[in-house]
């Protein structure tokens, strides 16, 4: 009996996604022979039963075609074949999955994104994907769900400012062994990708439209999901003694905001996610120069990742107690701005000499970390920020840096990152002696040493005895090209990483 499950557009509607198109996915136990393009998989071992069955049905034409193409089934290798006359398809894509043992959910998601981009570029409207027993393993539901997840992530586009946005997308039918199990796995991923889309759109939006107040307004829309939103304005921030956060926002008319988004899915001690939310970073009086300043609208990507994760946890109805604390400000130049040489007083009580006004992220995070510890007493605290150019020079944009006082958390998060293609590389703590100041307790930049490490060591002063992780995602927030699950614009980095980690631990 044919079983078909069509997925709703609920996650798209809940994402405040600015894209107008949405890929359509149907999971079925029967092949859709009316589709334009058929996609079938082929491992290096050549064990795929469905390929062999189709090849027999098509009188050996598929095998002859892949032999002519010297197709070996390597991962992401594609042989595009004009469909045999006896089929209703126009084309057949034979897609390599590499070695059977290496084809996991992360590989499936990347492949889904790249195949989707190929189909969109070729103006394909409908595609049938055979995912029935592609590996000989019992993981086909998870692989199919993640392939669809990758396709949908790649489909997301931010094109609100284009006169003629590209609205073309693809309707998919997946031939799977267990459509109900596949749909259940995809439903959870659909909730997570709603959080990713939110983070991407917040990050990609231009700075004049995505101010601290507008970011707060976007967060307020999540209350219908059972998320408690609290906002502290500049006067409240100042009253609490959060002098670092208050000072960074002085250069902008809006001032700073502290945004708290709390999803309480359990009575356990909370896990606090702390996000840097600099909606535009001019560098202040230590002003940035060069073309990179155009990317500084994305300096709030850490806060976007935190808000997207809290949303994802609410949509998945996770049994987790997660509080997101986001330090929002625009680092601008005006007569009210912090000047190099100023001394600020943090809520922790430590004074900080501002040697460089472009090292503002650690200042706003310091007060946000203090707030999370004081008012939520979290079991674990993880901060995420586009913090240092030094991280980009050390690791590029394929990895984010992870620095921590807890080896177990590093292992958990690094493993989670591998599962979702958001990779982490550990850097050490140290060089605290370089943060000394002659007139204050701390300098906001190190006098020497590796910049990513000295920035993390500054933040360590505000972690207390809490198990703490710092993630520096500088270079990971924006991409200019489509690749794997990513489309141009904000990446939403961190949402899938945190969601995978929270749901698995």
Model-flagged regions — what are they?
Residues 3, 10, 27, 83, ...:
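Generic detector of short alpha-helix boundary/capping microenvironments
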Residues 1-22:
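Gram-negative bacterial Sec-dependent N-terminal signal peptides
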Residues 2-3, 7, 104, 187, ...:
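Residues at the start of alpha-helices and the adjacent loop-to-helix junctions
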Residues 15, 31-32, 315:
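Generic structural signal for beta-strand residues in well-ordered domains
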Residues 216-505:
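A generic structural signal for tightly packed, nonpolar segments enriched in small/aliphatic residues
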Residues 21-270, 274-277:
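Short amphipathic alpha-helical segment within the helicase RecA-like ATPase core
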């Amino acid at each position: 009996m044919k079983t078909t499950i069509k997925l709703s557009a609920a996650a798209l509607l809940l994402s405040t996604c600015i894209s107008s198109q949405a890929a359509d996915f149907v999971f079925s136990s029967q092949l859709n022979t009316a589709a334009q393009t058929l996609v079938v998989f082929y491992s290096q071992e050549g064990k795929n039963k469905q390929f062999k069955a189709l090849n027999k049905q098509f009188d050996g034409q598929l095998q002859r075609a892949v032999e002519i193409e010297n197709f070996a089934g390597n991962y992401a290798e594609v042989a595009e074949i004009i469909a045999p006359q006896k089929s209703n398809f126009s084309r057949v894509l034979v897609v390599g999955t590499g070695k059977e043992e290496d084809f996991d959910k992360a590989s499936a998601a990347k492949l889904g994104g790249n195949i989707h981009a190929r189909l969109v570029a070729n103006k394909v409207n409908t595609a049938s994907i055979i995912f029935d027993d592609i590996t000989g393993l019992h993981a086909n539901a998870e692989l199919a769900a993640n392939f669809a997840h990758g396709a949908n992530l790649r489909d997301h586009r931010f094109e609100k400012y284009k006169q003629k946005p590209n609205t073309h997308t693809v309707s998919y039918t997946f031939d799977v062994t267990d459509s109900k199990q596949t749909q259940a796995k995809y439903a959870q991923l659909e909730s997570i990708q709603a959080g990713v889309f939110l983070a991407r759109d917040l990050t990609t939006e231009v700075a004049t439209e995505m101010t601290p107040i507008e970011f707060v307004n976007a967060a307020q829309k999540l209350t219908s999901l059972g998320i408690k939103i609290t906002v502290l304005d500049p006067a409240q921030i100042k009253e609490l003694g959060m002098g670092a956060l208050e000072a960074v926002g002085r250069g902008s008319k809006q001032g700073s905001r502290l945004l708290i988004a709390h999803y309480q899915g359990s009575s356990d001690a909370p896990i606090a996610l702390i996000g840097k939310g600099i909606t535009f970073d001019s560098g202040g009086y230590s002003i940035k120069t060069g073309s990179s300043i155009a990317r500084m609208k994305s300096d709030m990507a850490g806060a976007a990742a935190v808000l997207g994760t809290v949303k994802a946890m609410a949509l998945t109805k996770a049994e987790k107690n997660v509080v997101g604390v986001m330090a929002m400000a625009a680092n601008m130049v005006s007569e009210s701005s912090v000047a190099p040489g100023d001394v600020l007083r943090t809520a922790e009580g430590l004074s900080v000499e501002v040697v460089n006004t472009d090292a503002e992220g650690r200042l706003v995070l310091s007060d946000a970390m203090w707030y999370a510890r004081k008012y939520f007493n979290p079991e674990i605290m993880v901060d995420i920020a586009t913090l240092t150019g030094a991280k980009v020079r050390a690791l590029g944009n394929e990895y984010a840096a992870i620095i921590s006082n807890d080896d177990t958390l590093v292992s958990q998060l690094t493993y989670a990152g591998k599962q979702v293609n958001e990779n982490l590389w550990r850097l050490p703590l140290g060089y605290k002696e370089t943060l000394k100041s002659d007139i204050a307790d701390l300098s906001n930049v190190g006098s020497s040493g590796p910049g990513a490490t000295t920035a993390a060591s500054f933040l360590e002063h505000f972690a207390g005895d809490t198990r703490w992780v710092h993630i520096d995602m500088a270079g990971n927030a924006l991409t200019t090209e489509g690749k794997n699950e990513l489309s141009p614009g904000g990446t939403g980095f961190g949402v899938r990483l945190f969601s995978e980690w929270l749901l698995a631990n």
